[in-house]
Protein backbone atom coordinates (compact mmCIF):
# COMPACT_ATOMS: atom_id res chain seq x y z
CA UNK A 1 0.00 0.00 0.00
CA UNK A 2 2.67 2.48 1.10
CA UNK A 3 6.37 2.72 0.27
CA UNK A 4 8.83 4.09 2.78
CA UNK A 5 11.47 6.57 1.44
CA UNK A 6 14.83 7.22 3.05
CA UNK A 7 15.65 10.62 4.54
CA UNK A 8 18.29 11.41 1.92
CA UNK A 9 16.56 10.00 -1.11
CA UNK A 10 17.39 11.64 -4.43
CA UNK A 11 14.70 12.25 -7.00
CA UNK A 12 15.78 12.65 -10.64
CA UNK A 13 13.63 14.25 -13.29
CA UNK A 14 14.60 14.28 -16.97
CA UNK A 15 13.19 16.88 -19.30
CA UNK A 16 13.44 15.52 -22.87
CA UNK A 17 12.66 18.93 -24.33
CA UNK A 18 15.74 20.68 -22.96
CA UNK A 19 17.86 17.56 -22.41
CA UNK A 20 18.42 18.73 -18.87
CA UNK A 21 18.65 16.54 -15.84
CA UNK A 22 17.21 17.91 -12.63
CA UNK A 23 18.17 16.24 -9.39
CA UNK A 24 16.63 17.15 -6.07
CA UNK A 25 17.60 15.79 -2.66
CA UNK A 26 15.79 16.59 0.52
CA UNK A 27 17.36 16.28 3.93
CA UNK A 28 14.64 16.69 6.58
CA UNK A 29 17.24 16.81 9.35
CA UNK A 30 18.61 20.16 8.22
CA UNK A 31 15.40 21.25 6.49
CA UNK A 32 17.38 22.00 3.34
CA UNK A 33 16.63 21.07 -0.24
CA UNK A 34 19.35 20.96 -2.90
CA UNK A 35 18.44 21.13 -6.58
CA UNK A 36 21.07 20.49 -9.27
CA UNK A 37 20.50 21.27 -12.94
CA UNK A 38 22.91 20.01 -15.63
CA UNK A 39 22.66 21.35 -19.17
CA UNK A 40 24.64 18.99 -21.45
CA UNK A 41 24.53 21.49 -24.30
CA UNK A 42 26.66 24.14 -22.51
CA UNK A 43 28.06 21.81 -19.84
CA UNK A 44 26.95 24.29 -17.22
CA UNK A 45 26.20 22.92 -13.79
CA UNK A 46 23.71 24.95 -11.78
CA UNK A 47 23.17 24.03 -8.16
CA UNK A 48 20.47 25.58 -6.01
CA UNK A 49 19.96 25.00 -2.31
CA UNK A 50 16.98 26.17 -0.32
CA UNK A 51 17.17 26.31 3.45
CA UNK A 52 13.63 26.21 4.78
CA UNK A 53 14.74 27.41 8.21
CA UNK A 54 16.17 30.72 7.06
CA UNK A 55 14.30 30.87 3.73
CA UNK A 56 17.65 31.36 2.02
CA UNK A 57 18.04 30.76 -1.69
CA UNK A 58 21.63 30.29 -2.87
CA UNK A 59 22.43 29.73 -6.54
CA UNK A 60 25.88 28.82 -7.87
CA UNK A 61 26.83 28.36 -11.52
CA UNK A 62 30.11 26.99 -12.88
CA UNK A 63 31.17 27.49 -16.48
CA UNK A 64 33.95 24.96 -17.20
CA UNK A 65 34.92 26.74 -20.42
CA UNK A 66 36.02 30.02 -18.76
CA UNK A 67 36.34 28.65 -15.21
CA UNK A 68 34.27 31.55 -13.98
CA UNK A 69 32.44 30.98 -10.74
CA UNK A 70 29.55 33.33 -10.11
CA UNK A 71 27.52 33.18 -6.95
CA UNK A 72 24.47 35.16 -5.98
CA UNK A 73 22.46 34.90 -2.81
CA UNK A 74 19.13 36.43 -1.97
CA UNK A 75 18.06 36.02 1.62
CA UNK A 76 14.69 37.72 2.21
CA UNK A 77 15.39 37.99 5.92
CA UNK A 78 18.92 39.42 5.81
CA UNK A 79 20.25 40.18 2.31
CA UNK A 80 17.16 41.91 0.92
CA UNK A 81 16.77 45.21 2.75
CA UNK A 82 13.40 46.69 1.93
CA UNK A 83 14.32 49.95 3.64
CA UNK A 84 17.18 50.84 1.31
CA UNK A 85 16.15 48.56 -1.62
CA UNK A 86 19.78 47.73 -2.33
CA UNK A 87 20.92 44.72 -4.37
CA UNK A 88 24.55 43.63 -4.02
CA UNK A 89 26.28 41.41 -6.61
CA UNK A 90 29.85 40.12 -6.36
CA UNK A 91 31.80 38.08 -8.94
CA UNK A 92 35.34 36.66 -8.89
CA UNK A 93 37.38 35.93 -12.01
CA UNK A 94 40.05 33.34 -11.01
CA UNK A 95 42.04 33.94 -14.19
CA UNK A 96 42.92 37.59 -13.45
CA UNK A 97 42.03 37.52 -9.72
CA UNK A 98 39.88 40.59 -10.23
CA UNK A 99 37.08 41.10 -7.75
CA UNK A 100 34.25 43.22 -9.09
CA UNK A 101 31.15 44.20 -7.16
CA UNK A 102 28.16 46.21 -8.21
CA UNK A 103 25.26 47.57 -6.20
CA UNK A 104 21.98 48.97 -7.40
CA UNK A 105 19.93 51.26 -5.21
CA UNK A 106 16.36 50.92 -6.40
CA UNK A 107 15.22 54.00 -4.52
CA UNK A 108 17.55 56.46 -6.28
CA UNK A 109 18.30 54.35 -9.39
CA UNK A 110 22.03 54.80 -8.83
CA UNK A 111 24.25 52.05 -10.20
CA UNK A 112 27.76 51.81 -8.79
CA UNK A 113 30.45 49.26 -9.50
CA UNK A 114 33.92 48.71 -8.13
CA UNK A 115 36.78 46.46 -9.15
CA UNK A 116 39.99 45.54 -7.37
CA UNK A 117 43.08 44.50 -9.31
CA UNK A 118 45.67 42.98 -6.93
CA UNK A 119 48.37 43.18 -9.60
CA UNK A 120 48.46 46.99 -9.65
CA UNK A 121 46.92 47.45 -6.19
CA UNK A 122 44.35 49.77 -7.71
CA UNK A 123 40.75 49.99 -6.63
CA UNK A 124 38.39 51.49 -9.20
CA UNK A 125 34.88 52.61 -8.29
CA UNK A 126 32.39 53.97 -10.83
CA UNK A 127 28.83 55.14 -10.19
CA UNK A 128 26.23 56.36 -12.67
CA UNK A 129 23.18 58.37 -11.68
CA UNK A 130 20.64 58.01 -14.51
CA UNK A 131 18.57 60.88 -13.15
CA UNK A 132 21.25 63.54 -13.67
CA UNK A 133 23.49 61.48 -16.01
CA UNK A 134 26.46 62.22 -13.77
CA UNK A 135 29.33 59.76 -13.95
CA UNK A 136 31.69 59.77 -10.99
CA UNK A 137 34.70 57.54 -10.60
CA UNK A 138 37.30 57.19 -7.88
CA UNK A 139 40.52 55.22 -7.76
CA UNK A 140 42.77 54.33 -4.85
CA UNK A 141 46.38 53.35 -5.38
CA UNK A 142 47.37 51.25 -2.38
CA UNK A 143 51.08 51.46 -3.17
CA UNK A 144 51.24 55.27 -2.92
CA UNK A 145 48.21 55.67 -0.62
CA UNK A 146 46.86 58.41 -2.86
CA UNK A 147 43.10 58.61 -3.15
CA UNK A 148 41.68 60.50 -6.11
CA UNK A 149 38.11 60.91 -7.22
CA UNK A 150 36.61 62.60 -10.26
CA UNK A 151 33.08 63.38 -11.37
CA UNK A 152 31.83 64.42 -14.80
CA UNK A 153 28.62 66.36 -15.36
CA UNK A 154 27.64 66.11 -19.06
CA UNK A 155 25.24 69.04 -18.69
CA UNK A 156 27.94 71.61 -17.90
CA UNK A 157 30.88 69.58 -19.29
CA UNK A 158 32.69 70.13 -16.03
CA UNK A 159 35.09 67.61 -14.56
CA UNK A 160 35.76 67.77 -10.84
CA UNK A 161 38.91 66.08 -9.58
CA UNK A 162 39.88 65.73 -5.93
CA UNK A 163 42.99 64.00 -4.59
CA UNK A 164 44.11 63.36 -1.04
CA UNK A 165 47.68 62.50 -0.10
CA UNK A 166 47.67 60.95 3.41
CA UNK A 167 51.44 61.34 3.70
CA UNK A 168 51.30 65.13 3.64
CA UNK A 169 47.57 65.38 4.43
CA UNK A 170 47.16 67.75 1.50
CA UNK A 171 43.73 68.02 -0.05
CA UNK A 172 43.72 69.47 -3.55
CA UNK A 173 40.63 70.01 -5.65
CA UNK A 174 40.25 71.77 -8.98
CA UNK A 175 37.38 71.94 -11.47
CA UNK A 176 38.30 71.64 -15.15
CA UNK A 177 36.13 72.91 -17.99
CA UNK A 178 36.97 70.84 -21.12
CA UNK A 179 35.34 73.41 -23.41
CA UNK A 180 37.74 76.20 -22.49
CA UNK A 181 40.47 74.03 -20.90
CA UNK A 182 40.54 76.43 -17.99
CA UNK A 183 41.52 75.18 -14.55
CA UNK A 184 39.96 77.26 -11.79
CA UNK A 185 41.16 76.97 -8.22
CA UNK A 186 39.09 79.78 -6.78
CA UNK A 187 35.57 81.01 -7.31
CA UNK A 188 34.38 84.49 -8.17
CA UNK A 189 32.39 84.55 -4.97
CA UNK A 190 34.12 85.26 -1.66
CA UNK A 191 34.97 82.40 0.63
CA UNK A 192 31.89 81.06 2.35
CA UNK A 193 33.49 78.61 4.76
CA UNK A 194 37.01 77.77 5.80
CA UNK A 195 38.41 75.29 8.29
CA UNK A 196 42.04 75.18 9.38
CA UNK A 197 43.32 72.49 11.73
CA UNK A 198 46.86 72.35 13.08
CA UNK A 199 47.99 69.50 15.31
CA UNK A 200 51.46 68.65 16.57
CA UNK A 201 52.89 66.32 19.17
CA UNK A 202 56.24 65.51 20.68
CA UNK A 203 57.18 62.66 18.37
CA UNK A 204 58.06 65.11 15.62
CA UNK A 205 54.93 64.81 13.53
CA UNK A 206 52.86 67.81 12.54
CA UNK A 207 49.71 67.91 10.45
CA UNK A 208 48.01 70.83 8.76
CA UNK A 209 44.72 70.43 6.94
CA UNK A 210 42.69 73.18 5.36
CA UNK A 211 39.46 73.19 3.42
CA UNK A 212 37.88 76.16 1.67
CA UNK A 213 34.50 76.02 -0.03
CA UNK A 214 33.17 78.64 -2.44
CA UNK A 215 29.69 78.99 -3.88
CA UNK A 216 28.89 80.88 -7.05
CA UNK A 217 25.38 82.31 -6.61
CA UNK A 218 24.87 82.69 -10.37
CA UNK A 219 25.47 79.09 -11.38
CA UNK A 220 25.15 77.54 -7.90
CA UNK A 221 28.42 75.71 -8.47
CA UNK A 222 30.21 74.63 -5.33
CA UNK A 223 33.97 74.52 -5.69
CA UNK A 224 36.38 73.51 -2.96
CA UNK A 225 40.07 74.17 -2.69
CA UNK A 226 42.53 72.84 -0.17
CA UNK A 227 46.15 73.66 0.42
CA UNK A 228 46.40 75.83 -2.70
CA UNK A 229 45.52 78.90 -0.64
CA UNK A 230 47.44 77.84 2.45
CA UNK A 231 51.03 78.66 3.27
CA UNK A 232 51.92 76.52 6.25
CA UNK A 233 54.97 75.37 8.13
CA UNK A 234 55.27 73.31 11.27
CA UNK A 235 58.38 72.08 13.01
CA UNK A 236 59.17 70.42 16.32
CA UNK A 237 62.50 70.27 18.08
CA UNK A 238 62.48 67.03 20.10
CA UNK A 239 65.38 68.15 22.24
CA UNK A 240 63.71 71.34 23.46
CA UNK A 241 60.08 70.43 22.65
CA UNK A 242 59.62 73.70 20.79
CA UNK A 243 56.56 73.56 18.59
CA UNK A 244 56.12 76.35 16.08
CA UNK A 245 53.40 76.35 13.49
CA UNK A 246 52.15 79.15 11.28
CA UNK A 247 49.36 79.32 8.77
CA UNK A 248 48.21 82.10 6.49
CA UNK A 249 45.16 82.12 4.29
CA UNK A 250 45.20 85.21 2.08
CA UNK A 251 41.74 84.63 0.62
CA UNK A 252 39.98 84.33 3.97
CA UNK A 253 39.68 86.43 7.07
CA UNK A 254 42.07 84.87 9.54
CA UNK A 255 45.84 84.86 9.75
CA UNK A 256 46.83 82.82 12.77
CA UNK A 257 50.23 82.02 14.19
CA UNK A 258 51.03 80.07 17.31
CA UNK A 259 54.31 79.35 19.03
CA UNK A 260 54.60 77.15 22.09
CA UNK A 261 57.78 76.96 24.13
CA UNK A 262 58.51 74.43 26.81
CA UNK A 263 61.73 73.34 28.45
CA UNK A 264 62.65 69.71 28.84
CA UNK A 265 64.38 68.11 31.82
CA UNK A 266 68.14 68.00 31.91
CA UNK A 267 69.84 64.85 30.75
CA UNK A 268 69.64 62.69 27.67
CA UNK A 269 66.42 62.67 25.72
CA UNK A 270 65.16 59.18 25.01
CA UNK A 271 62.03 57.76 23.50
CA UNK A 272 60.94 56.55 26.93
CA UNK A 273 60.92 60.05 28.36
CA UNK A 274 57.73 60.59 30.31
CA UNK A 275 57.55 64.26 29.36
CA UNK A 276 55.14 64.64 26.47
CA UNK A 277 53.79 67.75 24.90
CA UNK A 278 50.89 68.34 22.55
CA UNK A 279 49.35 71.43 21.06
CA UNK A 280 46.11 71.47 19.10
CA UNK A 281 44.61 74.57 17.54
CA UNK A 282 41.28 74.54 15.76
CA UNK A 283 40.23 77.68 13.94
CA UNK A 284 36.94 78.00 12.14
CA UNK A 285 35.72 80.93 10.10
CA UNK A 286 32.35 81.01 8.43
CA UNK A 287 30.57 83.64 6.41
CA UNK A 288 27.02 83.38 5.14
CA UNK A 289 25.20 85.63 2.72
CA UNK A 290 21.58 85.63 1.64
CA UNK A 291 19.49 87.63 -0.77
CA UNK A 292 18.40 89.93 2.06
CA UNK A 293 22.00 91.13 2.36
CA UNK A 294 22.50 89.62 5.79
CA UNK A 295 26.08 88.73 6.58
CA UNK A 296 27.31 86.84 9.61
CA UNK A 297 30.96 86.34 10.40
CA UNK A 298 31.90 84.10 13.29
CA UNK A 299 35.16 82.62 14.38
CA UNK A 300 36.12 80.44 17.30
CA UNK A 301 39.59 79.69 18.53
CA UNK A 302 40.33 76.94 21.02
CA UNK A 303 43.73 76.32 22.53
CA UNK A 304 44.37 73.16 24.46
CA UNK A 305 47.83 72.63 25.88
CA UNK A 306 48.67 69.67 28.06
CA UNK A 307 51.90 68.52 29.64
CA UNK A 308 52.46 65.42 31.72
CA UNK A 309 55.41 63.65 33.27
CA UNK A 310 58.18 64.34 35.73
CA UNK A 311 59.69 67.22 33.79
CA UNK A 312 60.31 70.56 35.42
CA UNK A 313 58.48 72.74 32.91
CA UNK A 314 59.26 75.99 34.65
CA UNK A 315 59.10 77.95 31.40
CA UNK A 316 55.87 77.55 29.50
CA UNK A 317 54.11 80.23 27.54
CA UNK A 318 51.69 80.66 24.67
CA UNK A 319 51.78 83.51 22.21
CA UNK A 320 48.84 83.89 19.85
CA UNK A 321 48.23 86.38 17.07
CA UNK A 322 44.85 86.88 15.45
CA UNK A 323 43.57 89.09 12.68
CA UNK A 324 40.29 90.89 13.15
CA UNK A 325 37.90 89.93 10.31
CA UNK A 326 36.47 93.44 10.05
CA UNK A 327 39.57 95.64 10.11
CA UNK A 328 42.25 93.01 9.33
CA UNK A 329 44.21 94.41 12.25
CA UNK A 330 46.63 92.06 13.96
CA UNK A 331 46.18 91.74 17.70
CA UNK A 332 48.52 89.81 19.97
CA UNK A 333 46.93 88.06 22.88
CA UNK A 334 48.64 88.17 26.28
CA UNK A 335 50.88 85.36 27.35
CA UNK A 336 49.09 82.93 29.61
CA UNK A 337 51.21 82.27 32.69
CA UNK A 338 51.60 78.83 34.14
CA UNK A 339 52.63 77.53 37.52
CA UNK A 340 56.35 77.68 38.16
CA UNK A 341 56.94 74.92 40.67
CA UNK A 342 59.38 72.13 41.14
CA UNK A 343 56.74 69.45 41.55
CA UNK A 344 56.17 66.48 39.30
CA UNK A 345 53.59 68.25 37.16
CA UNK A 346 53.09 71.72 35.81
CA UNK A 347 50.27 74.12 35.20
CA UNK A 348 47.93 73.43 32.30
CA UNK A 349 46.58 76.64 30.81
CA UNK A 350 43.40 76.17 28.81
CA UNK A 351 42.10 79.13 26.86
CA UNK A 352 39.13 79.41 24.55
CA UNK A 353 37.82 82.42 22.72
CA UNK A 354 34.98 82.98 20.29
CA UNK A 355 34.03 86.06 18.28
CA UNK A 356 30.76 86.59 16.48
CA UNK A 357 29.97 89.56 14.25
CA UNK A 358 26.63 90.00 12.57
CA UNK A 359 25.31 92.79 10.41
CA UNK A 360 21.96 93.12 8.70
CA UNK A 361 21.02 95.72 6.15
CA UNK A 362 17.74 95.99 4.38
CA UNK A 363 14.81 98.13 3.47
CA UNK A 364 11.43 97.61 5.05
CA UNK A 365 8.40 98.59 3.03
CA UNK A 366 5.09 99.60 4.58
CA UNK A 367 2.01 100.53 2.61
CA UNK A 368 -0.86 102.65 3.83
CA UNK A 369 -3.59 104.22 1.68
CA UNK A 370 -1.75 103.19 -1.50
CA UNK A 371 1.40 104.95 -0.29
CA UNK A 372 4.53 102.84 0.06
CA UNK A 373 7.11 104.01 2.58
CA UNK A 374 10.64 102.63 2.35
CA UNK A 375 12.71 102.59 5.53
CA UNK A 376 16.32 101.39 5.60
CA UNK A 377 17.22 99.21 8.57
CA UNK A 378 20.80 98.62 9.64
CA UNK A 379 21.64 96.58 12.71
CA UNK A 380 24.71 94.76 13.93
CA UNK A 381 25.64 92.55 16.82
CA UNK A 382 28.92 91.44 18.28
CA UNK A 383 29.70 88.84 20.89
CA UNK A 384 33.07 87.83 22.27
CA UNK A 385 33.59 85.27 24.98
CA UNK A 386 36.82 83.96 26.39
CA UNK A 387 37.70 81.57 29.18
CA UNK A 388 41.07 80.75 30.67
CA UNK A 389 41.78 78.15 33.33
CA UNK A 390 45.11 77.80 35.08
CA UNK A 391 45.44 74.61 37.10
CA UNK A 392 48.27 74.58 39.57
CA UNK A 393 49.39 71.23 40.93
CA UNK A 394 49.46 70.08 44.51
CA UNK A 395 52.13 72.06 46.32
CA UNK A 396 53.44 70.24 49.42
CA UNK A 397 53.59 72.31 52.57
CA UNK A 398 56.61 71.68 54.77
CA UNK A 399 56.00 70.91 58.41
CA UNK A 400 58.15 69.94 61.35
CA UNK A 401 55.46 67.59 62.63
CA UNK A 402 56.02 64.22 61.07
CA UNK A 403 52.44 63.24 61.79
CA UNK A 404 50.97 65.96 59.59
CA UNK A 405 51.05 66.13 55.82
CA UNK A 406 49.30 68.79 53.83
CA UNK A 407 49.04 69.87 50.23
CA UNK A 408 47.38 72.75 48.43
CA UNK A 409 46.13 72.97 44.86
CA UNK A 410 44.82 76.10 43.16
CA UNK A 411 42.61 76.40 40.10
CA UNK A 412 41.97 79.80 38.55
CA UNK A 413 39.26 80.25 35.95
CA UNK A 414 38.58 83.41 33.99
CA UNK A 415 35.47 83.81 31.89
CA UNK A 416 34.62 86.92 29.94
CA UNK A 417 31.75 87.64 27.59
CA UNK A 418 31.03 90.85 25.72
CA UNK A 419 28.03 91.52 23.56
CA UNK A 420 26.98 94.61 21.66
CA UNK A 421 23.76 95.12 19.75
CA UNK A 422 23.60 98.56 18.14
CA UNK A 423 20.97 99.35 15.54
CA UNK A 424 19.89 102.43 13.61
CA UNK A 425 16.60 102.97 11.87
CA UNK A 426 16.31 105.89 9.49
CA UNK A 427 13.14 107.15 7.89
CA UNK A 428 14.93 108.56 4.84
CA UNK A 429 16.27 105.97 2.39
CA UNK A 430 18.68 108.47 0.84
CA UNK A 431 20.74 108.60 4.03
CA UNK A 432 21.92 105.08 3.37
CA UNK A 433 24.18 106.31 0.57
CA UNK A 434 26.28 108.53 2.83
CA UNK A 435 26.82 106.04 5.65
CA UNK A 436 30.28 104.82 6.41
CA UNK A 437 29.00 101.55 7.85
CA UNK A 438 29.92 99.61 10.93
CA UNK A 439 33.46 99.32 12.15
CA UNK A 440 34.36 96.36 14.32
CA UNK A 441 37.33 96.40 16.65
CA UNK A 442 38.30 93.45 18.80
CA UNK A 443 40.49 95.48 21.14
CA UNK A 444 38.09 98.27 22.06
CA UNK A 445 35.79 98.16 25.05
CA UNK A 446 32.80 97.95 22.74
CA UNK A 447 33.49 95.54 19.90
CA UNK A 448 31.28 97.42 17.45
CA UNK A 449 31.18 101.20 17.13
CA UNK A 450 29.05 103.31 14.88
CA UNK A 451 30.67 105.79 12.53
CA UNK A 452 28.06 107.38 10.33
CA UNK A 453 27.87 110.67 8.50
CA UNK A 454 24.57 112.07 7.30
CA UNK A 455 23.96 114.93 4.96
CA UNK A 456 22.38 117.93 6.63
CA UNK A 457 19.36 117.69 4.38
CA UNK A 458 18.66 114.10 5.32
CA UNK A 459 19.46 114.02 9.04
CA UNK A 460 16.29 112.25 10.08
CA UNK A 461 17.38 109.47 12.42
CA UNK A 462 14.34 108.32 14.32
CA UNK A 463 15.82 105.91 16.86
CA UNK A 464 19.22 104.79 18.07
CA UNK A 465 19.38 101.74 20.34
CA UNK A 466 22.63 100.34 21.67
CA UNK A 467 22.95 97.61 24.24
CA UNK A 468 26.30 96.40 25.53
CA UNK A 469 26.73 93.49 27.91
CA UNK A 470 30.04 92.81 29.59
CA UNK A 471 30.33 89.81 31.87
CA UNK A 472 33.56 88.69 33.48
CA UNK A 473 33.81 85.89 36.00
CA UNK A 474 36.87 84.96 37.98
CA UNK A 475 36.80 81.79 40.02
CA UNK A 476 39.62 80.61 42.25
CA UNK A 477 39.34 77.16 43.79
CA UNK A 478 41.77 76.32 46.58
CA UNK A 479 41.90 72.74 47.83
CA UNK A 480 43.80 71.90 51.01
CA UNK A 481 44.38 68.36 52.22
CA UNK A 482 45.63 67.74 55.76
CA UNK A 483 46.40 64.23 56.99
CA UNK A 484 46.69 63.87 60.77
CA UNK A 485 47.58 60.76 62.75
CA UNK A 486 45.35 61.58 65.65
CA UNK A 487 45.86 60.21 69.14
CA UNK A 488 42.48 61.51 70.27
CA UNK A 489 39.67 59.01 70.73
CA UNK A 490 38.74 55.91 72.61
CA UNK A 491 41.83 54.11 73.81
CA UNK A 492 40.03 50.78 73.60
CA UNK A 493 39.32 51.34 69.89
CA UNK A 494 41.88 49.61 67.70
CA UNK A 495 40.66 50.97 64.35
CA UNK A 496 42.37 53.57 62.17
CA UNK A 497 43.13 56.86 63.81
CA UNK A 498 44.17 58.75 60.69
CA UNK A 499 42.20 61.90 60.01
CA UNK A 500 42.02 63.65 56.66
CA UNK A 501 40.59 67.14 56.39
CA UNK A 502 39.88 68.59 52.96
CA UNK A 503 38.93 72.22 52.52
CA UNK A 504 37.85 73.72 49.23
CA UNK A 505 37.43 77.47 48.96
CA UNK A 506 35.92 78.93 45.83
CA UNK A 507 36.27 82.68 45.34
CA UNK A 508 33.98 83.82 42.54
CA UNK A 509 33.78 87.37 41.27
CA UNK A 510 31.19 88.07 38.59
CA UNK A 511 30.95 91.73 37.66
CA UNK A 512 28.35 91.89 34.91
CA UNK A 513 27.57 95.28 33.46
CA UNK A 514 24.66 95.90 31.14
CA UNK A 515 24.07 99.28 29.56
CA UNK A 516 21.20 100.20 27.28
CA UNK A 517 21.05 103.51 25.45
CA UNK A 518 17.75 104.43 23.88
CA UNK A 519 16.82 108.03 23.14
CA UNK A 520 19.52 109.37 25.47
CA UNK A 521 18.40 107.22 28.40
CA UNK A 522 20.86 104.82 29.94
CA UNK A 523 20.86 102.19 32.66
CA UNK A 524 23.75 100.17 34.01
CA UNK A 525 24.39 97.48 36.64
CA UNK A 526 25.51 94.81 38.22
CA UNK A 527 28.31 93.31 40.36
CA UNK A 528 28.27 89.95 42.10
CA UNK A 529 30.79 88.44 44.49
CA UNK A 530 30.60 85.13 46.30
CA UNK A 531 32.81 82.95 48.45
CA UNK A 532 32.13 79.29 49.12
CA UNK A 533 33.97 77.08 51.58
CA UNK A 534 33.50 73.32 51.64
CA UNK A 535 35.18 71.32 54.37
CA UNK A 536 35.22 67.53 54.47
CA UNK A 537 36.86 65.38 57.12
CA UNK A 538 37.45 61.67 57.46
CA UNK A 539 38.19 60.37 60.92
CA UNK A 540 37.71 57.42 63.24
CA UNK A 541 36.17 59.07 66.30
CA UNK A 542 33.05 58.90 68.35
CA UNK A 543 29.83 60.56 67.29
CA UNK A 544 30.29 64.26 66.75
CA UNK A 545 27.80 66.63 65.18
CA UNK A 546 27.61 70.36 64.98
CA UNK A 547 25.90 73.06 63.01
CA UNK A 548 26.86 76.69 62.66
CA UNK A 549 24.68 79.17 60.83
CA UNK A 550 25.34 82.87 60.38
CA UNK A 551 23.22 85.21 58.33
CA UNK A 552 24.15 88.76 57.62
CA UNK A 553 22.50 91.14 55.22
CA UNK A 554 22.82 94.84 54.71
CA UNK A 555 21.21 97.17 52.25
CA UNK A 556 21.98 100.81 51.72
CA UNK A 557 20.42 103.04 49.14
CA UNK A 558 21.09 106.60 48.13
CA UNK A 559 20.56 108.76 45.15
CA UNK A 560 22.23 107.26 42.07
CA UNK A 561 23.56 104.38 44.15
CA UNK A 562 22.25 101.13 45.55
CA UNK A 563 24.32 98.58 47.41
CA UNK A 564 23.24 95.28 48.87
CA UNK A 565 25.41 92.69 50.54
CA UNK A 566 24.42 89.29 51.88
CA UNK A 567 26.56 86.74 53.68
CA UNK A 568 25.41 83.28 54.61
CA UNK A 569 27.54 80.82 56.55
CA UNK A 570 26.56 77.23 57.17
CA UNK A 571 28.77 74.69 58.89
CA UNK A 572 27.83 71.08 59.54
CA UNK A 573 30.04 68.42 61.07
CA UNK A 574 29.05 64.77 61.12
CA UNK A 575 31.27 61.98 62.38
CA UNK A 576 29.96 58.50 62.97
CA UNK A 577 31.41 55.90 65.25
CA UNK A 578 34.06 53.57 63.86
CA UNK A 579 33.75 55.10 60.43
CA UNK A 580 36.55 55.77 58.00
CA UNK A 581 34.54 58.25 55.92
CA UNK A 582 33.15 61.04 58.07
CA UNK A 583 31.98 64.09 56.16
CA UNK A 584 31.71 67.65 57.34
CA UNK A 585 30.69 70.43 55.02
CA UNK A 586 30.63 74.17 55.23
CA UNK A 587 29.67 76.96 52.87
CA UNK A 588 30.15 80.71 52.88
CA UNK A 589 28.23 82.64 50.28
CA UNK A 590 28.33 86.37 49.82
CA UNK A 591 26.88 88.46 47.06
CA UNK A 592 26.97 92.14 46.27
CA UNK A 593 25.11 94.11 43.66
CA UNK A 594 25.57 97.70 42.61
CA UNK A 595 22.91 99.50 40.62
CA UNK A 596 22.87 102.97 39.18
CA UNK A 597 19.48 104.63 39.33
CA UNK A 598 18.20 108.12 38.68
CA UNK A 599 16.29 108.53 41.91
CA UNK A 600 16.29 106.78 45.25
CA UNK A 601 16.02 107.01 48.99
CA UNK A 602 18.37 106.12 51.81
CA UNK A 603 17.63 102.83 53.51
CA UNK A 604 20.02 100.88 55.71
CA UNK A 605 19.11 97.53 57.19
CA UNK A 606 21.30 94.95 58.88
CA UNK A 607 20.29 91.57 60.20
CA UNK A 608 22.63 89.18 61.97
CA UNK A 609 22.06 85.70 63.34
CA UNK A 610 24.35 83.07 64.79
CA UNK A 611 23.29 79.55 65.71
CA UNK A 612 25.54 76.83 67.05
CA UNK A 613 24.51 73.27 67.83
CA UNK A 614 27.00 70.77 69.18
CA UNK A 615 26.85 67.22 70.44
CA UNK A 616 28.63 65.79 73.40
CA UNK A 617 32.02 65.58 71.70
CA UNK A 618 33.32 68.60 69.80
CA UNK A 619 35.86 68.30 67.04
CA UNK A 620 39.00 69.06 68.96
CA UNK A 621 41.32 68.70 65.99
CA UNK A 622 39.61 71.28 63.81
UniProtKB/Swiss-Prot annotation:
Domain of life of the organism encoding this protein: Eukaryota
Compositionally skewed regions (Low complexity) per UniProt: 47-199, 379-389
Induction trigger: Induced by pheromone. Down-regulated by RIM101 and inositol.
Compositionally skewed regions (Polar residues) per UniProt: 14-35, 396-405
Annotated stretches, region: Disordered: 1-35, 47-200, 374-405
This protein's name: Pheromone-regulated protein PRM7
Name of the coding gene: PRM7
Amino acid sequence: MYRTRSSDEVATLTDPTSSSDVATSADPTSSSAVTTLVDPTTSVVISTSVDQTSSSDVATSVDPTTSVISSTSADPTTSADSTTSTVQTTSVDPTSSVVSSSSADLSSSVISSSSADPTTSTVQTTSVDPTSSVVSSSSADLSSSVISSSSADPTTSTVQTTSVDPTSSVVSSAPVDPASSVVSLTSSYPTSSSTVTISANSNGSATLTAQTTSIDPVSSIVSSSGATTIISSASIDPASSVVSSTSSEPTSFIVSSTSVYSTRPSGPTTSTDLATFSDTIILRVSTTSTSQDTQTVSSSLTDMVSSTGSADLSVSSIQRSQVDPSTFAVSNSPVYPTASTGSTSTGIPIASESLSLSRQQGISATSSSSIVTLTPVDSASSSRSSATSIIKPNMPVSSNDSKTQSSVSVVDTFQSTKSSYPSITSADPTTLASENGLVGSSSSAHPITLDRTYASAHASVTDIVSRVTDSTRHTTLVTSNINIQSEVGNLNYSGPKDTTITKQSAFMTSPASTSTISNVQSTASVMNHSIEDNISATASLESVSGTSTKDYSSQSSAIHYTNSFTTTTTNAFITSKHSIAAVSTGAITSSASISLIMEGSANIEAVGKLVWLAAALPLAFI
